[in-house]
């Protein structure tokens, strides 16, 4: 069974929207998580195929902001939770709030930690490959260990009269950059599904995991 080459990556996108607020105390940054670009075209020398991700979940346990404040002192703000997130919800899932004093921060790192919960994986993505010849094969990607999404920004300003929402968008269009058609053609199929995990098709898992950890960018909107 031919499975076409696939290019997917993770892009972490943080969107900040400001609105007026009367309080002048520490401010809450609300973290949200969503997915974008759920279908990718995959090319072969003969004809193009596609992959469509149709469902997925994440087990979020910690959100964190690390930075240097105006005194050049390293600071950390975090909040713990235990939430099973539907990554394919029509609206971004809210993870919780990180409380931070107003001010200007530099070398800012935004982090979301995922951790397995019992038999539930830290991250699951389900979908299907459609080859250039029209053959459809289900696929599941599983992360069964703790991992962290991290994105960086040079400078961030938090005022005492604004609320901020940080939306992390997982771009499913670039996650498997570096995976060749030959590797997919040789993938092990278990009960009709290509399972990509730390114990199945590990060569594919290692590439996707590296992209998941490393491929991030941050965009700020005030």
Residue ranges and their predicted role:
Residues 2-9:
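Sec-dependent signal peptide recognition
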Residues 15-18:
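C-terminal motif of bacterial Sec signal peptides marking the signal peptidase cleavage site
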Residues 20-222:
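A short, solvent-exposed, low-complexity linear motif enriched for acidic/polar residues
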């Amino acid at each position: 069974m031919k499975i076409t080459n696939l290019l997917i990556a993770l892009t972490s996108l943080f969107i900040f929207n400001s609105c007026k607020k009367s309080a002048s105390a520490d401010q809450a940054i609300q973290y949200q998580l969503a997915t974008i670009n759920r279908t990718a075209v995959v090319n072969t020398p003969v004809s193009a195929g596609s992959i469509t991700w149709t469902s997925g979940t994440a087990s979020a346990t910690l959100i964190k902001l690390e930075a240097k404040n105006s005194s050049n002192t390293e600071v950390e703000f975090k909040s713990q939770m235990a939430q099973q997130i539907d990554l394919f919800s029509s609206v971004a899932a809210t993870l919780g709030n990180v409380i931070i004093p107003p001010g200007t921060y530099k070398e800012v790192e935004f982090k979301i930690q995922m951790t397995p919960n019992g038999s539930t994986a830290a991250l699951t993505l389900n979908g299907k490959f459609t080859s250039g010849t029209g053959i459809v094969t289900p696929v599941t990607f599983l992360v069964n260990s703790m991992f962290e999404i991290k994105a960086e920004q040079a400078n961030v300003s938090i005022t005492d009269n604004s609320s901020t929402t940080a939306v992390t968008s997982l771009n499913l269009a670039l996650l498997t950059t570096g995976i060749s058609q030959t590797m997919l053609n040789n993938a092990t199929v278990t009960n009709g599904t290509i399972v990509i995990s730390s114990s199945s098709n590990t060569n594919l898992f290692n590439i996707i995991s590296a992209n998941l950890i490393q491929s991030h960018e941050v965009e700020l909107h005030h």
